[in-house]
Amino acid sequence: STKIVLVGAGSAVVGVRLISDLVFTEGLRGSHLVLVDIDSERLDMVYRIGTKLIAEQDAKLRLSKCEDYREALSGADYVITTVARGGAGAWLNDVRIPQAYGYNYAVGDTMGPGGLFRALRTIPLVVDIAREMEEACPDALLINYSNPMTAICRAVNKYTSIRAIGLCHGLQNTVRRISPRLGLEPSEITAWASGINHFIWLTDIVHSVTGEDLYPKLVERAKKMPSEQPVAYDLLNTYGLFPSGGDDHIVEFIQYYTSHECGKGAAHNIDLNYVEKAVAHQKQELEELEKLASVPSLRATDAIQGTAESAAEIIDCLSNAKTGVFMVNVPNNGRIPNLPAEAVVEVPGITTPSGVMGVQVEALPLGIAGRITACIHEFELMVEAAVHGERRLALQALLINPFTRSRVDAERLLDELIKANEPYLEQFR
């Protein structure tokens, strides 16, 4: 049977939804799912909900749990990582502390100081997991959901022999957002994109049934500058392609939308209190899950929705020799011709008997490729700083970021964030 290990299962909402996806994937019946998390209480809650889901659907899934990933990896076929060291407190620090130095962004999990320190906390753990996989399950596929996606996947590819892909729901969310503008249901739209995670650009958008090219309609809507996603539509007007990922993510890559001149994001409806609201929402969802786990009469199937993620479907395809096409983060190696070969890029990928293969796509417009290339160099500095624990490289990652206006402030910010993250930065001690 297929053995799937979910590391970070205590990221409760994601963990439960991934279990739900697996439960409802017919081709994975008989599989063994191992839940792993260092938070024993959260792990037990997710395990109880998973047990409910399996029983309600008679899913024939074997479910087990443990707190140490090293105990779970032996013989695994797939290892899914959804880890976020430091939790909500670290995430809030990633956004709030830099704001005092003029770094204004919403999500803060990909680029700049927030992305850097999430990388410094997370990359060593995921690389350690991959190194353990080299001994315990060398042929397994690592499927990463943790952010910053590009940097984490690059670190695994660069410093281990483990095959790794990264998955994100950005394109699905974009299709859902633009479908009302096109007068269609999301299911009526087929879209593909390329770029880097949280900064991919729609290359194709067609009607799923008729094959009609929907890009001209999207361009026409952009001329009216809709109030929803004004940054994305502004970029469509500028570059001729529509960026996927949502404005809250996109502004981490392009600093002027949250500059003082743009009212710190107000001119483009960017909410700099995004993280506080997200943390409050997560807390509410967690309370609902705790109730679901502890009240026998509540049905898990009625309460849990799937993720719109593709991990379960990809595992089904790979395990049962099916062909599917998905958005994946993989090493570039020429797939996007005008981006660095060693970079991790997000492109369509096809499941094959030998794994998930990213497809060759067209070169991106020069203006977009130039921005992405600068980001790729920033990610490379994050990887090196995280793996080697070098403050100098972390500073260089800050200095290359377009939000940085002062070396002195960048050094002060770096010291403050290192101190705030001290429990999670073993490599800097």
Where in the sequence are the language-model features?
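N-terminal Rossmann-like dinucleotide-binding module
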Residues: I4-G30
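Rossmann-fold NAD(P)-binding glycine/threonine-rich loop
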Residues: G89-K158
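Long, compositionally biased stretches enriched for glycine and/or charged residues
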Residues: P180-R429
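Glycine-rich phosphate-binding loop and adjoining beta1-alpha1-beta2 segment
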Residues: F24-D58
